[in-house]
From Swiss-Prot:
GO terms for molecular function: ATP binding; metal ion binding; nicotinate riboside kinase activity; ribosylnicotinamide kinase activity; ribosylnicotinate kinase activity. The active site is at D35. It comes from Mus musculus (Mouse). This is Nicotinamide riboside kinase 2. ATP binds at residues 9-17, 130, 134-136, 174-176.
Amino acid sequence: MKLIIGIGGVTNGGKTTLTNSLLKALPNCCVIHQDDFFKPQDQIAVGEDGFKQWDVLESLDMETMLSTVQAWVKDPHKFARAHGVSLQSGASDTHVLLLEGFLLYSYRPLVDLYSQRYFLTVPYEECKRRRRSRTYMVPDPPGLFDGHVWPMYQKYRREMEQDGVEVVYLDGMKSPEGLFHQVLEDIQNRLLNTS
């Protein structure tokens, strides 16, 4: 059995923390981080708002990300070995792929591949506070959060909802442990009910 689980949502919402916890707990589990598919900095457009457009779908090489997912679907054993994942012998017929990122549900060719889609949310003020506390390879220029990051999050979330993409909303204000146990239990139930 193969499951593809999406862990999407707002920037600094807890996606990576949740994904890393699930990765350790699930059998034969691999992860693909959307952030690994950013185009080179010199290919990122500057928008009318004056900011580099990092928070738009066009800043990502989604075709390559889709190809990577398709490689896992075709042969999860080979994919796991190539990515240094040790397969558990007792669960050899169970494979889980976690996709983690902020625009997972905006690229139509990926949307229907998910077995389950989660979407982390946090309120504006908390998101802004968390964003300020992080250090990025390309530092945020003044005004980026209010002028670009938050408006793009709102735009893509609205489009996702208008397109009818079904997600399980998760409250990113809950403790990381609480979110982990909620999602792990959900995935384990899905594995039990489909085996």
